[in-house]
Amino acid sequence: MIASSAKIHPSSAIENGAVIGENVKIGPFCHIGPNVVLADDVEILSHVAVIGHTSVGKGTKIFPGAVIGGDSQSVHHSALNTKLVIGENCTIREGVTMNTGTVEHGGATIVGNNNLFLAYSHVAHDCRLGNNIILSNNVMLAGHVTVEDRAILGGGSAVHQFTRIGRQAFIGGLSAVSYDVIPYGMLNGNPGVLSGLNVVGMTRAGIDRPAIHRVRRCYKQIFEGDGSIRANAAAIRNEYLDCAPAIEILDFIAAESDRALSSPNRGAKG
């Protein structure tokens, strides 16, 4: 079904079954597959493929050379019952690739709203991305990665499968992220190590200075204490019940995960 207000270049191929919303714009030489849903006001420039069971949210804009909804790059891939869901008002720049999920792990790759994907970044199968995230040029997310709201990943950084990146974390360019990164954490290097807190991001998010000082103290207690990271976090939780950012970090540490936790020292700690 193609809305009457949609504008589609005659050189583009729209397969039967595709759903094209109101005011959608599709430029030249694009391919829209039969199981694709483009919500209202989506804009697709030239030479874009949107395939698979893929839905693209309202107002999202996709630039030339992107391939959205391709099969997962997994040896266990099955095209049955797998999908890619992209939220509203995302910007997907040149050469970006996003894959559908795998049946073994729920079948869906989920991307939230207002995200910016710069050129040649990659979102692999079964990833879960929140809102207001930035993936800079050539960022690579392996399968099953979780990226929480407002995280920023610097150019060329690579994230190991099943890794979690917490809310408003900042990953430096060319970093290798092999272990979970706490909310508000800054990570740099290969191998990646924590280098402190994203204080600039915290300030921009409206977290006041007294709260930031408390989170810094919490960070030191977690990573400089005598026990493991998780033991240290559990021991101090009651001290921070009135400090939401600190509790967010402590709850992130306590949550189950397939990966260990990034730390300020080489390697990971539990």
From Swiss-Prot:
Known function: Involved in the biosynthesis of lipid A, a phosphorylated glycolipid that anchors the lipopolysaccharide to the outer membrane of the cell.
CDD domains: LbH_UDP-GlcNAc_AT
SUPFAM superfamilies for this protein: Trimeric LpxA-like enzymes (SSF51161)
Catalytic reactions of this protein: a (3R)-hydroxyacyl-[ACP] + UDP-N-acetyl-alpha-D-glucosamine = a UDP-3-O-[(3R)-3-hydroxyacyl]-N-acetyl-alpha-D-glucosamine + holo-[ACP]
Molecular functions per Gene Ontology: acyl-[acyl-carrier-protein]-UDP-N-acetylglucosamine O-acyltransferase activity
Localization (cell): Cytoplasm
GO BP: lipid A biosynthetic process
Species of the source: Rhizobium meliloti (strain 1021)
Enzyme Commission identifier(s): 2.3.1.129
GO cellular component: cytoplasm; membrane
EC category name: transferase
Family that this chain belongs to: Belongs to the transferase hexapeptide repeat family. LpxA subfamily.
Lineage: Bacteria, Pseudomonadati, Pseudomonadota, Alphaproteobacteria, Hyphomicrobiales
The protein's name: Acyl-[acyl-carrier-protein]--UDP-N-acetylglucosamine O-acyltransferase
Pathway named in the protein's UniProt entry: Glycolipid biosynthesis; lipid IV(A) biosynthesis; lipid IV(A) from (3R)-3-hydroxytetradecanoyl-[acyl-carrier-protein] and UDP-N-acetyl-alpha-D-glucosamine: step 1/6
Keyword Ribosomal protein among UniProt keywords: no
